[in-house]
Design a protein with these regions (language model features):
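The Walker A/P-loop phosphate-binding site
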Residues: 2-98, 103
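Short gly/ser/thr-rich secondary-structure transition/capping motifs
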Residues: 16-23, 123-124, 199-203
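Phosphate-binding/switch region of NTP-binding enzymes
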Residues: 37-38, 43, 47-48, 77, ...
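Residue-level signal for alpha-helix termini/capping positions
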Residues: 59, 134, 172-176
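Conserved inter-motif catalytic segment of the P-loop NTP-binding fold
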Residues: 71-158, 165
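Conserved alpha/beta core segments of nucleic-acid transaction machinery
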Residues: 242-305
Length: 305
């Protein structure tokens, strides 16, 4: 039988002390040992936001070079994605993290692409994830999209509850790393009718209510207008941390082919600058179907036109 927690006296609870630095991303966006869930329709640009968070964590710099968010210190990040593959992942990292010094941030950013056997409803799939984490020893793992990491019924509270329990066990096994998870999940198809809907509501998550009841923080996204020159689009977002104050809605500007600034804050959230700032990346292969390290460093000093 696993070790069970016992009830605490309130006096003992009140006397407990907690570390000051309890979050990988502030303000209260990604708790150490917690879970952040992204949500939105396909092709909105969620992956660009996730990669920017990975960049910021692995380099210890502000996400989006924005005054809204901060990273108290560097964290080792493992990105596991099921859709792009290594060729497209290389292209995205290369575009996002131009002008690299390959040795600048070695051992802080890793990628693992297209591992269909990593199915968390099976013991073999769980072991695959465990082994990948054990190989890298990351502080943060990104699973994108979570729907391709399991064979559970996404509409079942029981089965999705089981999925989150399995993820909690994984985090518990690496508690010495303060392991946190960032997951991406899809929204259900928008309803058709005369009434205007809240496109950023967490109730838009497809499937079981466990998707939006269980994580520590929810981040929802909706694609806005495309730029006139077709070079990018606006991306509305809402960040809902359970451990802190909800931010004002934030709109990002996504420019996938812009080598100087792929993602930046356009408006909202109380941002004081919204410019692009320092970033970097390069990649060297480690071993077949084990995560490989991604290193980066570059200068970005460009404001939105």
């Amino acid at each position: 039988m696993s070790e069970q927690k016992l009830p605490l006296k309130i006096s003992d609870l009140l006397s407990m002390t907690f570390p000051q630095n309890s979050f990988w991303i502030e303000p209260a966006i990604l708790p150490k040992g917690g879970t952040l869930l992204f949500g939105g329709a396909a092709k909105t640009g969620k992956s660009f936001i996730m990669l920017e968070l990975a960049r910021a964590l692995s380099t210890g710099t502000r996400p989006f070079s924005s005054s809204i968010f901060s990273v108290p210190g560097k964290a080792k990040v493992l990105v596991i994605e099921q859709e792009l593959g290594e060729r497209e992942s290389q292209s995205r990292y290369s575009n996002l993290l131009k002008n690299t010094r390959p040795s600048a941030y070695n051992d802080y950013l890793y990628n693992l692409s297209k591992v269909p056997s990593m199915q968390l409803n099976s013991n073999e799939g769980l072991k695959y994830l465990y082994d990948a984490i054990d190989h890298v020893q990351p502080n943060v793992v990104i699973l994108d999209p979570i729907s391709m990491f399991h064979g559970f019924d996404e509409n079942s509270n029981t089965e999705i509850g089981d999925l989150f329990k399995r993820l909690e066990k994984i985090k518990g096994a690496f508690s010495h790393l303060s392991l946190s998870l960032i997951l991406s999940h899809h929204f259900k198809k928008p309803s058709v009718g005369p009434y205007k809907t809240d496109t950023l509501s967490p109730y838009n998550f497809s499937g079981s209510q466990r998707w939006f009841n269980t994580p520590d923080t929810l981040a929802t996204f909706h694609r806005g207008k495309t730029l006139k020159d077709k070079s990018g689009w606006f991306l509305d977002s809402r960040w809902i941390p359970r451990m802190g104050k909800q931010l004002d809605d934030i709109t990002f500007l996504i420019r996938p082919e812009d080598e100087d600034c792929q993602v930046q804050v356009h408006s909202g959230g109380g941002d004081k600058d919204g410019t692009c700032g320092p970033t970097t990346l390069g990649a060297t292969s480690a071993s077949s179907k084990l995560p490989f390290v991604v290193s980066r460093e570059r200068e970005r000093e460009r404001e939105i036109d």
